[in-house]
Amino acid sequence: LFLHYMVLSWQIVRFQLKETFAIAYGNYTYREALIITLQKNESKGYGECTSIDYYHISLVDFEVILSKIKSQIEKQSIIHPTEFYAFLLQLDLPSFLRSALDCAYWDLFGKLEKKPFLELNKIDFTNLPESSITISVDTVENQIKKIEKSAWTKFKVKCNHFDEMDIIKLLQLDKSLALDSNGSFTKENCYWLENNEVVSKFAYLEQPMKPGSDNYKVLHTNKFANWMADEDCQSLSVLKKLQPHYRSINIKLVKCGGLTPAMEMIAIAKELNYKIMIGCMTESTIGISAGAALAPFCDYADLDGANLIANDIAKGSQIINGKIHLSESNGLGIKLR
């Protein structure tokens, strides 16, 4: 059956987590994700976005939007993904949903062209950062036990309050650690952190305070802390403004709207001398395979999402004990299990 047009379908999937995921925003035992499929003839491309309450993301709302735009999307002929992205921009979609569609289209396009994403974009993938694994909010003793037992070598430690002694204990470990407080620190905490030389041992300190320039204006790039913007860095437009305050940024495909805008954002961030991390939500191999394709451009990677899920539904690029194994199959190399 040869079709002149694409077929768009979707489903909501519940991922059980291997263990409770505890961060400053709350505790989670599962995550729900919207999985998008774009099909032409025998080829299928896949994209994913996760339900995140602190970003006010409702997958049911997304389903309503998809029902409304289904026929417009299906009418598109196969054009270059950057042109498809320009079409998506006209639909005025939430960034999470635009990202799932953009990634699904890149995956489909590569499969139709019989070329991997890395080849389509002439990406040299000889140098890959190693991914961190997330250590949930817990007592510092339990966090240290988990770190010491792990086969991974890089760790992102989540915390929901500031404790000087905890920080000293963590830094006594001979491990590569980053600290992510998901906005739970105060200005005073940040002053202590950026003026304390021992803090330079952290690879980075992510989103120390709640987002907004009232908070981040007290952060300085020329002190000991390598501050990294997450919620403060949603799009290209803020990169210049964040420059005096954040040395590093966390780029997540769902935040910026997909692979297409992420590549543009990475290019501009590099010109502005930012250190760049490719990040993820708690997502399956579908979302992780898309993020991993941009790891060659980045200084840091936080792509452990699929490693936290008990019932992954796809195969593609893999993160094994932090090492990124990029799929060399066509598109993003995603196949459903």
Where do the PLM segments sit?
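Active-site cofactor/co-catalyst pockets and adjacent glycine-rich loops in catalytic enzymes
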Residues: 306
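Catalytic core of soluble alpha/beta enzymes
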Residues: 157, 162-295, 310-322
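Alpha-helix C-terminal capping segments
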Residues: 111-112, 293-297
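N-terminal capping/lid subdomain adjacent to the active-site entrance of alpha/beta enzymes
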Residues: 2-177, 182-191, 196, 315-337
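Short helix/strand-capping turn motifs
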Residues: 299-302
